Regions:
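Glycine-rich phosphate-binding "P-loop"
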Residues: 105-133, 204-219
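SIR2/sirtuin-family catalytic core signature
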Residues: 1-47, 53-57, 68-81, 85-94, ...
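Active-site-proximal helix-loop elements at catalytic-domain edges
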Residues: 1-26, 116-123, 190-213
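Short, active-site-adjacent cap segments at secondary-structure transitions
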Residues: 54-55, 158-160
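Active-site glycine-centered loops adjacent to acidic/histidine catalytic or metal-binding residues
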Residues: 50, 155
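A short secondary-structure junction signal
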Residues: 161-166, 197-204, 247-253
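Short acidic/polar capping segments at secondary-structure boundaries
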Residues: 156-159, 165-166, 191-195, 241-244
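Conserved RecA-like ASCE P-loop NTPase motor core of nucleic-acid helicases/translocases
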Residues: 151-153
């Protein structure tokens, strides 16, 4: 292959030797967990939270949120049942779908109606902010309060704020240029839609393609700056994120650029089982996980693999402060 391409192929990534043996993800996970425990005991840390955290409290995933908005739109042509077809129309892209919904509503709704539609689709009348995962995240902050610096969330909701408050942890939502108070900060880098519809804290979220591009291209956007600060100055723990967001990956690359040190951040990800119907499923799944692991190492991340989002993941978060 090297003779054919005229190049020398890499033998390792960040010191990880590529082996012909099957990747033992369980042993690798256990070693990574030990690294994580030591790291957050010795260093300040930040928590990066994604949709998986809010979904554990029965809030909708991104696609269900968009479907709920379609269903509540007053234009009357498309309904929630049309989501699969509309997804194809929008090239299977959630942010393109977000733009489609905005355009669909633009002539029929004002900004207030759009926000209200989003609020109803997000909460659907359910005042829920509790789950085993959220409880363990709160306990992690409680037990490591001196090291815990902030939450950076990509979620619109205030699930974490209400959960922290119920645990006696004073906190403050930051969703723009509002200045932090002397409380535990929760940064909403994609916008903020609290359960209690208060006029003075409404923040239109990053929902559609053009809004996403506006954040992406502006390196000095407050949300990009806060994420870079956390990535550069603290150990970061990623929970409930798919890690496919292009802007997040770009910021990780920037923060990790030219670094010769071992990966300093940690991401919890579900085990890969894409090849479950294949005869060589275990081998292929393990190999895919090995390659993914090395890809994330290039971004400065160590992977902690888990099997169950609702049972195993909370146990691993608990182990961080146990």
């Amino acid at each position: 292959m090297e003779q054919f391409l005229g190049i020398q192929l890499p033998r390792n990534t960040r010191g990880s030797v590529i082996s012909e043996a099957t990747y033992d993800w369980r042993n690798d996970r256990d070693r990574t967990m030990e690294h994580a425990k030591v790291s957050i005991a010795e260093n300040n840390f930040s928590l990066f939270l994604g949709a998986g955290v809010s979904m554990s409290a029965n809030l909708p995933c991104w696609w269900n949120l968009l479907a709920g908005m379609i269903n509540r739109c007053k234009q009357g042509i498309f309904k929630e049942a049309d989501l699969d077809q509309l997804t194809k129309v929008c090239c299977n892209s959630s942010i393109v779908m977000g733009r489609f919904i905005r355009m669909m509503m633009e002539s029929k709704s004002n900004e207030e109606e759009f926000y209200q539609c989003l609020h109803e689709a997000l909460y659907n009348g359910v005042d829920s902010y509790s789950s085993p995962l959220i409880t363990e995240i709160c306990h992690l902050i409680q037990f490591k309060r001196q090291q815990a610096q902030s939450i950076i969330t990509y979620n619109f909701d205030d699930v974490m704020e209400r959960a922290l408050k119920s645990c006696g942890i004073g906190n403050y939502s930051i969703f723009g240029q509002n200045q932090p108070q002397q409380l535990f900060p929760v940064y909403h880098v994609h916008g903020f839609v609290p359960f209690e519809n208060k006029e003075n804290i409404k923040s239109l979220p990053v929902l559609s393609e053009e809004e996403y591009h506006r954040v992406y291209v502006n390196s000095y956007n407050w949300s990009n700056v806060e994420q870079i600060h956390a990535l550069s100055r603290t150990t970061c723990i990623f929970i409930g994120l798919s890690m496919t967001d292009p802007n997040l990956r770009r910021l990780l690359d920037i923060a990790n650029k030219d670094s010769e040190a071992d990966p300093r951040h940690f991401v919890f990800l579900p085990c890969i089982d894409s090849f479950d119907k294949d005869k060589a499923a275990e081998v292929k799944n393990n190999e895919a996980m090995r390659i993914q692991k090395e890809m994330f190492e290039e971004l400065g991340l160590r992977v902690v693999w888990y099997k169950g989002h609702n049972d195993e993941l909370p146990k691993f978060i608990k182990a961080l402060h146990g």
